[in-house]
């Protein structure tokens, strides 16, 4: 019997007993669609976990332990932009397992440092071969004897964990006509879509990606998604009609401005989701198709924008954008729609 299965860590970190998400209403004064009966709400992961990837990372390690892929002698390796890697590193550290995070050279140093600080069995490296992505590197290393790659970009435990833990808490707090989330692994959007489908809900799930050449931390461009992600996202989303996109500058700017509007300081991938949400709502207002999303109980469109983590791991990137030097540092513009196409 693999003793890791019965480790006390699993009981202590049971997501079903934690608060995983909080919901705040976006001020109507800052909502460009308030007069159209649209209520914009912000769902932020910071609750009793640092970020929403923690339950998913836990599920990935536990799934492999139960299946016997991870034993006390296994080295766990995972491609990560930071949050999943940090969560898996914490879990492996507690279990006494060696963990290697594969991270791109452009990952902020602050995100690398929180993994490095764990010390002990935890290490990180960049891809070693020319043209190799972090994901392909982790998959290659995971095939070695006594190594295992949980692979958040392919493992069904990723969307399943969001459907099992995040979705019930989210839908228990608010009606959700439209759910907008940054797309990194496609796991969050697939999990919410799966939950909605299984519960007979009409919720429209909108994944938001970076425009090509407009990278935002913890999100992907469509070309990178096609290269790395093996989860069957096409079962839920049409590439031509269901995806929204955003630019880097607008994503950083809108997340920065949101710190004055809600009691949370969410990171740049939230800004990307907010850009995508506003673009989505603008498109449907122009085409006269907003009514299809109205909730039967109150006739309102409840648009929920998801923020996976807060701003602190990206301090250096915010400073590099120098948002504090321009007019936006003095207040929030009256019309956010003027900002969502900025580059």
What does each of the following model-derived ranges do?
Residues 1-343:
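PLP-dependent amino-acid enzyme catalytic core
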């Amino acid at each position: 019997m693999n003793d890791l299965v019965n480790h006390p860590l699993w009981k202590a970190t049971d997501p079903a007993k934690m608060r995983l998400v909080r919901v705040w209403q976006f001020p109507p004064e800052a909502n460009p669609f308030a007069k159209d009966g649209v209520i914009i709400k912000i769902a932020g992961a910071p609750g009793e976990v640092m970020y929403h990837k923690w339950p998913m990372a836990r599920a990935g390690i536990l799934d492999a332990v139960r299946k016997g892929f991870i034993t006390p002698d296994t080295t766990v390796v995972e491609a990560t932009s930071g949050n999943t890697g940090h969560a898996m590193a914490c879990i492996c550290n507690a279990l006494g397992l060696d963990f290697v995070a594969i991270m791109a050279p452009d990952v902020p140093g602050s995100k690398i440092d929180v993994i490095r600080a764990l010390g002990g069995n935890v290490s990180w490296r960049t891809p070693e071969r020319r043209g190799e992505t972090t994901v392909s590197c982790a998959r290659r290393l995971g095939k070695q004897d006594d190594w295992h790659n949980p692979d958040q970009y392919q493992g069904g435990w990723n969307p399943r964990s969001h459907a099992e833990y995040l979705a019930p808490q989210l839908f228990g707090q608010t009606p959700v006509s439209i759910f907008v989330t940054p797309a990194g692994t496609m796991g969050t959007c697939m999990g919410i879509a799966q939950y909605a489908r299984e519960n007979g809900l009409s919720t429209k799930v909108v994944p938001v990606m970076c425009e090509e050449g407009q990278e935002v931390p913890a999100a992907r461009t469509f070309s990178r998604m096609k290269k790395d992600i093996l989860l069957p996202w096409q079962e839920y989303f049409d590439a031509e009609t269901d995806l929204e996109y955003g630019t880097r500058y607008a994503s950083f700017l809108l997340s920065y401005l949101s710190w004055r509007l809600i009691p949370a300081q969410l990171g740049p991938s939230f800004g990307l989701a907010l850009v995508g949400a506003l673009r989505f709502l603008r498109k449907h207002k122009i085409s006269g198709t907003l009514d299809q999303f109205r909730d039967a109980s109150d006739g309102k469109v409840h648009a929920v924008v998801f923020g996976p983590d807060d701003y602190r791991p990206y301090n250096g990137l915010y400073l590099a954008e120098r948002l504090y030097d321009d007019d936006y540092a003095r207040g929030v513009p009256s019309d956010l729609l003027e900002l969502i196409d900025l580059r």
